[in-house]
């Protein structure tokens, strides 16, 4: 069963088994997202408890520490050690091809993923012992023209919007990850 979650208005994360955070433009709602301290805190707590999360583009931005828009910093969820700085021109725009290079809950190492990206933000990674990049960019920009895909706990967040037709297993892998966690 799919459940809609509104990060602008909801105060808590409902009882869910896994979470997909799609793309969008969080910079257009940065103040409202930052103001919803209760939801941001609840989501971070669920992530720390092991909630499987798959996030694309705007979802990546929302899970970071902060979003900087026109020089003003807005706190985000803080589940990933990066800040995002909004630029005036696109930082990534077009089709992407990624090679999975690091262990993660959703894709085997060596798999090639296809998708697209469109983002005005630039990622600034903060050093962290418990977070790793897991994709090598073969086509596109990702985070810096070379890497994409941050993995921490059961979270995988990427600028790339995966093309479901080109990667039909991705949704099932989110659910399999949840069920494999239940059996541990």
What do these predicted ranges mean?
Residues 1-43:
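Acidic, glycine-rich loop-and-beta core segments that form the ion-binding/anion-interacting portion
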Residues 2-8, 63-65, 99-103, 142-145:
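Glycine-rich, charged/polar anion/phosphate-binding loops
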Residues 5, 22-24, 65, 82, ...:
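Fold-independent oxyanion-binding glycine-rich loops
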Residues 19, 56, 77, 118, ...:
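Hydrophobic, well-ordered secondary-structure elements that form the walls
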Residues 26-106:
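Cysteine-nucleophile active-site neighborhood
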Residues 86-184:
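Amide-donor transfer/coupling interface in amidating biosynthetic enzymes
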């Amino acid at each position: 069963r799919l459940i809609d979650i509104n990060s602008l208005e909801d105060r808590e994360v409902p009882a869910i088994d896994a979470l997909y955070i799609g793309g969008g433009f969080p910079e257009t709602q940065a103040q409202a997202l930052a103001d919803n301290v209760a939801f941001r805190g609840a989501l971070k707590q669920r992530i720390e408890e092991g909630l499987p999360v798959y996030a694309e583009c705007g979802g990546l931005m929302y899970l970071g520490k902060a979003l900087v828009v026109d020089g003003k910093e807005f706190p985000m969820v803080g589940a990933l050690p990066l800040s995002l700085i909004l630029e005036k021109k696109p930082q990534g725009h077009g089709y992407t091809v990624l090679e999975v290079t690091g262990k993660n809950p959703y894709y085997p190492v060596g798999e090639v993923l296809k998708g697209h990206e469109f983002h005005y933000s630039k990622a600034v990674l903060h050093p962290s012992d418990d977070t790793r990049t897991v994709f090598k960019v073969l086509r596109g920009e990702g985070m810096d023209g070379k890497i994409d895909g941050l993995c921490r706990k059961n979270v995988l967040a990427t600028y790339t919007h995966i093309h479901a037709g080109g990667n039909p297993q991705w949704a099932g892998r989110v659910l399999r990850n949840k069920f494999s966690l239940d059996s541990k």
